[in-house]
Each structure stands twice: as structure tokens, then as C-alpha cells.
Amino acid sequence: MRLPHPLPFARRVVALGVVTALAACSTLPPYSPPTVAVPTHYAGAPAAQPGWQVAAPADAASRGAWWTVFNDADLNALEARVDVSNQTVKKAVADLEQARAMVDYQHAGFLPTVTAGVAQSRSRISRNKLGSSLAGKTTSDHQVGVAASWEPDVFGRVRDAVAGAQANADASAADLQAVKLSVTAELATDYFALRSLDTQKQLLDDTVRAYADALKLLKQQLAAGAIDASAVAQAETQLEATRTQDTDIDASRAQLQHAIATLVGENASTFALPARVQAFDVPAIPAGVPSQLLERRPDIAAAERRVAAANAQIGEARAAFFPDLVLSASAGLESGFFMPWLTAPSLFWSLGPQLVGTLFDGGRRSATLRGAHAQYDGEVAGYRQTVLSAFQQVEDQLSALDALASEAASQQRATDAAALSLRLTTNRFNAGAVSYLDVVTAQTIALTNRRQADEIAARRMEASVGLLKALGGGWHAGADITAWAAGSGTAIKTQGS
């Protein structure tokens, strides 16, 4: 008895093994984060040592809640509510979960797909169907079976898709931290603005009471004939003008309170923040060296991860030029009669590979690849623009803090001088040496300078918050970015090195 020659089957097995071994190949281009040049030090801060280094998001370095540097218990309590109740943060969390789900979706491409089904049908064949022995007859079909298919990742299409999805998920994780930083900074800014209004409100309330007492005294003097009516008119004008400022403070404070309510996730109609007068203590904030900015800013990390995702899309576009290999198998039971349906003679099965490739598509794949390269170039430009904007924001806040410190010192001297002038002018009026108009003028100047001093103090706190935000705040990302941060970095060349 002659046995069938085994060579054809062996050839098929060897060919299949060779194609499967190509799964180690990948069309993904080698990736390294874009390089950016940074100065050795900020223009508004002491110089740092020049040199080269590689910067990656320092996720493992916890810096805590950055707002605690202000030592304000009310602010700390409000900031703690952001993670729990702020709706913008919740949306960013949902976006992150969606990105993570896409990673799982793409990763499923490594695994086979298995389906199962059962079907029963009864049909009648047309009498006029030529060449059919069943013409005019009614037949039944009973079938149950399973099918499996698997597409080996020969050219890395699935790996590239997973890499792109993971990079996008990492970007979403950094986006979440950027949203938190933005919301907490906005909350701190609004809070200090509100506290500044509380201080100014108390100043205006005290001033209104003092002006009212002075007006009462002037009216008594007018009745006694000691002064003329112009002094009373001037005092009344000054009192009502100050009351107008006092009312305006109330409206501005209400708007800030409503904004804070929204940031902490509470209805503005039910939220109230009791007034409290406090002296602002501007903290010392070390800016560090510019290269650290690339390690701290979550928006920079997000931009870099989007560059990586665009790089992975190039790999996916390249993989489309290669054929797809699909291994499929199916088995089941099928019978035209119900009784023998679930018996061994009803068994059927099939097994085999399929290799399919596109020969002509009118240039669609080439266009997709060009688009992927263009998207990569755009993401690189976006990353570098994010870095430039980050340095601009830091320099802006450093300059503002430096200028405001000088302004505060000058304004304090002006406030002290105005207070002294008011005391001297009041004494001269009481001695009959000047008119009450001189007193009104001195009072207005003194009040204006005190309010300006309070406003400068609030602006210094706002600039401090802005600097902390520009420096990345207390960003501490989780394990999502830590994994890639350990294996990739941004090469930085410091100018002048």
C-alpha cells in the first residue's frame, strides 16, 4: 500500500511557521521624545549650573498639595472638595477611563475570537429550480457549532495600535492632572481675591462710620454757626461716595463666592463663605532650574505622549501595506433531521489559513501614511509650543512677583505718608487754619492708598498662585505615566552650554 507523500502538508506547515515567525517584526518607527533647548536659569531667578540632562515627568516625586504653602485652613478645606465634587475634574476622569478602555480594546487584538451558535430552519425548494433533486420538496436543517479565528500580529499592526492607545491613555492621565491643577489654581485665585474684598469691606465699613460721625459733628457745628454749609455738603458727598464703593464691594464678593461654589461642585444658591479679614503672607517659592519645568508640568507630559501616539499611528499606517494572515477553524453538528442531529455522523469541521492583501486602493494607504507623518509633525510642533508657553508663563509670574514686591514697598510708604498727612490736615482744620475741603482731600487720598495697598497684596498672592501653577503645582501622577517615564525622556540642551 502506497502512503500519501507528506511533502505538500510539510510545506504548508513550514510556510505557516515562517509567516508566524514574522510576528516579531514591527513597522513602528523608533521613537524618542522631541528635543528642546532651555535656558540655564530663569531671567527672574538666580542662575543655575549649565549642562545637559534628560527630563522626564518626575511622577514618583510627590510634592503634596501645593496650596498648603499658604497656611490657610479655609483654602485647604475648599481645595479638598475639588477632587470629590468638581464636575470638570469628573469629566476628565471619565475621559481617562475611556482612554484606558481603548487600550483594553486594542490589546484584545492579540487574542483569538471564538463564536458559538445554534440554528434551525425549514424551507421549500422551488419546483422550477433546474438541476435540483430537491425541487418542490420541503427540507429542514439543524446546526450547532463553534468557530474560532486568530490573526497573528505578523507586521506589528496590533502592537502599534496598543502602543498608540497606551500613549493616548497616558496623555489623558496627564490631562487629568492638568485639569486639577487649573481648577485648584483658579479656586485659590478666587479665594484670595475674595479675602482681599473682605479686608477692603471692613476698611470701607469703618470709613463710612467715621465719615458719618464726622458729618454729624459738622452739622452740630453748622447749627452753632461755627462753620459754613459748604463743609457739610462736602462731608455728605464724601460719605455717599464711600457708601457706593462699599456696595460695589458686596456685589464683587458675591460673584467670587458664586465662582468658588461652582469650583467646589455646589450650587451657588446654597453656598456661603463667611467673611474673614486676614493679612496676606506671600510665600517664598523656589522656581528651580528651567529643565525641571519639563518634569513637573502635566500639560508638557500630555503633549509628549501625544507625539508618541502619533508615532504609533505611523506604524499602523505602514502595516496596512502588508497582507493580513487569518487562521480560522470551525466545528459542529449539522443534520437535515432532528433525531440524528446530535450524533457523531452529523459532525463537520474545517481548518485553514487565509492570507489577504490589497493590490490596489487608488493611493488610499499612501495618503493615510502621509497624513500620519503630518500628524506626527503637528504633535511635535504642539509639544514644543507647549514648552515655550510654559517658560513664558513662569517668566511672566516671576516678573510680576518681582515688580509687585517693589510696588508693595512703595505703596506702604505712600500709605504711611497719606495717613500722616490726614492727621496733620485734621489738626489744622480743628485749629481753623484750613477749610474742610482740605480734610476731605486728605481723607480721600488716605483711603485710596490703603485700598491700593490691599489690592497690591492680593495681586501678589494671585501671582504666587500663578507661579505655582506655571511650575506644575504639586503634580503627582500615578502609575499610568510612571511606567513610560522610567524608559523614555526628553533630551534637553541648555543654552550657553
Descriptions of predicted regions:
Residues 2-84, 142, 166, 250-295, ...:
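Terminal intrinsically disordered/low-complexity segments used for targeting and assembly
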Residues 142-148, 190, 289, 349-355:
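Hydrophobic, lipid-facing positions within transmembrane beta-strands of outer-membrane proteins
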Residues 117-123, 149, 197, 238, ...:
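Outer-membrane beta-barrel pore domains and translocons
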Residues 222-226, 429-433, 470-474:
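A short glycine-centered flexible hinge/capping loop motif at secondary-structure junctions
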Residues 158, 167, 173-289, 400, ...:
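Periplasmic alpha-helical coiled-coil/stalk elements that build and connect Gram-negative outer-membrane
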Residues 127-133, 234, 274, 322, ...:
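Outer-membrane beta-barrel translocator domains and adjoining extracellular loop/strand segments
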Residues 26-187, 325-329, 362-369:
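Short flexible linkers and secondary-structure junctions
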Residues 91, 107, 152-180, 230, ...:
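Sec/SRP-type N-terminal targeting helices
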